[in-house]
Regions:
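N-terminal Sec-pathway targeting helices
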Residues: 2-17
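Hydrophobic alpha-helical membrane-insertion segments, chiefly the h-region
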Residues: 14-28
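Primarily the internal scaffold of c-type cytochrome electron-transfer domains
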Residues: 26-141, 182-205, 210, 215-336, ...
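Membrane-entry segments of alpha-helical transmembrane domains in multi-pass membrane proteins
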Residues: 150-164, 191-204
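Long amphipathic alpha-helical segments
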Residues: 483-492
Length: 492
């Protein structure tokens, strides 16, 4: 691909600066540097870093700390967003060698995160995701400073020394994996290589190199190749900053095995976003059509035979996709709402804050929002209460539908686990066509639910899009209820 010939051409030999640490405004350090332009700073950094590269190029954010301390130190603040089980991990005597900024916690690793599988949260996930990693472990996410640690400690992969996971699990957790993929010359697809062989290979968390250009580090860029394909002609200098966020904050799945001679626009195991036509195709319907075309599923639901799909958090689609959010239509960027420009109290220098958070958690940003909104916090809370509640209701209804479906088509195996059985389905009065349609409904309805449930704003980004997804999910379950002759609606 062209991106390999240009974007990664300098890796492992003549790479100058893989990325500027969090450029975006002309933020400078001190003294004479405060008078330098962003371009001059970039040249200085490149000169200083020319000999500080490894096989991936210069990807370590700490290389830029002395030149861009304001951006770098604000990035370290993402360590304040502690993952749920991090404190327990440290208390057990483990040493974390990859996360950064944890010294800012002063030994207090208390987390405010929740386990979404708990009974007072969204326990339906255990049923809707049965057979997939989501049913094993699903917590509120922590900060970017912990992204590599999370891969090894998220409860889905287990011990990486014995895990069946693949390198693709790191796709949105470290920039290193993309540089490695671009230069891979081994057997088969890089993305399907066993994670056991790479468990100690990655040390850099989500940082500078994920979002900033190599040769001109004052600009943004996209690392993930398939996202470049999915964006198509819509990836340009006006969209690249949002697309840099979107390459991870989008829906993607790990591609199935690609047969030799296939015209599939991806390789085996590659993280794939299910879109062809740029922004106009970025909606749930086009995604489902893409997955259907390639016969793709993340897993087979054992008790019903449905071919299931898992959705990652599709913030980009909710904001900039086929049905843009109100804020996107007004021209706002991800950075406007989740980063913002702040002024250093000591030097008076303005810089882009890289402690990426909800604007509700940033007083300066919230004050700016409230120049248009009367009370943004209350507005968001009202939207979230409504949409998150109805998303939960759809999840509970989809769960009950699965139970109803199982009653018609499943029998216990030798270990007592329910498995799909065609003869049982026919004996219970279903036709083969009805079974196929019910399996399709499970695939689609759960996808609509998952598309909404996994998006981190809980409705705030794009209420209209959430409403559309929930309506479509419920309409499918209405059809399923008619086929099965029993209601899936769960009374509150």
């Amino acid at each position: 691909m062209q991106v390999k010939e240009t974007r990664f051409a300098a890796v492992a030999g003549t790479c100058l600066a893989c990325m500027l640490a969090f450029a975006g405004v002309a933020a400078v350090a001190s003294g004479e540097e405060q008078k330098a332009s962003a371009d001059n700073q970039a040249r200085e950094v490149i000169a200083d870093a020319a000999f500080e590269y490894d096989q991936y190029g210069v990807i370590d954010a700490s290389y830029w700390a002395d030149k861009f301390p304001l951006e770098y130190n604000s990035y370290l603040m993402t360590a304040m967003d502690v993952p749920l089980e991090y404190g327990e991990y440290i208390a057990e005597g483990n040493v974390d060698t990859t996360s950064v900024g944890t010294d800012l916690l002063d030994g207090d690793y208390t987390s405010t995160k929740v386990n979404f599988l708990d009974e007072d949260q969204y326990p339906e996930i255990k049923t809707l995701g049965k057979g997939y990693g989501y049913a094993k472990y699903y917590t509120e996410p922590g900060g970017h400073a912990y992204s590599v640690w999370v891969v090894a400690n998220n409860g889905r992969l287990g011990d990486l020394s014995e895990s069946k996971g693949k390198v693709s699990c790191y796709a949105c957790k470290t920039p290193q994996v993309h540089f490695d993929a671009a230069n891979y010359e081994g057997e088969g697809s890089y993305w399907t290589q066993p994670i056991t062989e790479y468990k100690d290979a990655f040390t850099e968390n989500v940082s500078c190199a994920n979002c900033h250009e190599n040769e001109d580090p004052t600009t943004n860029a996209v690392l993930r190749e398939d996202w470049i394909r999915a964006m198509g002609d819509d990836l340009d200098e006006t969209t690249v900053a949002n697309a840099a966020c979107g390459q991870c904050h989008c829906d993607y799945s790990m591609a199935p095995t690609v047969e030799e001679g296939s015209d599939a626009p991806f390789e085996s195991g590659e993280p794939v976003s299910p879109y062809y036509g740029g922004l106009a195709s970025m909606n749930a319907e086009d995604a489902l059509a893409f997955y259907d075309e390639y016969g793709f599923s993340d897993w087979t639901y054992a008790s019903t035979g449905a071919q299931m799909l898992a959705v990652r958090h599709a913030e980009f689609e909710f904001n900039y996709g086929a049905n843009p959010s109100p804020m996107a239509q007004m021209g706002y960027t991800c950075a406007d709402c989740h980063m913002g420009t702040v002024t250093d109290e000591e030097t008076g220098v303005e810089y882009t804050d890289h402690n990426i958070q909800s604007p509700l958690d940033k007083p300066e940003l919230l004050a700016s929002c409230n120049t248009c909104h009367t009370d943004l916090a209350s507005e968001v809370a009202s939207i979230q209460e409504d949409i998150d509640g109805r998303t939960h209701e759809l999840g509970l209804r989809a769960e009950q539908f699965i139970f109803n479906f199982e009653d018609k088509v499943a029998i216990p195996d030798a270990d007592g686990n329910l498995v799909f059985d065609t003869d049982t389905a026919l004996a219970n009065g279903l036709t083969e066509d009805q079974v196929a349609r019910l399996q399709e409904i499970q695939r689609y309805a759960c996808y609509y639910w998952n598309f909404a449930a996994a998006e981190n704003s809980e409705g705030a980004h794009n209420p209209d899009m959430f409403n559309d997804l929930l309506e479509k999910g419920n309409a499918l379950l209405d059809e399923a209820d008619e086929i099965l002759g029993v209601s899936s609606i769960v009374e509150a």
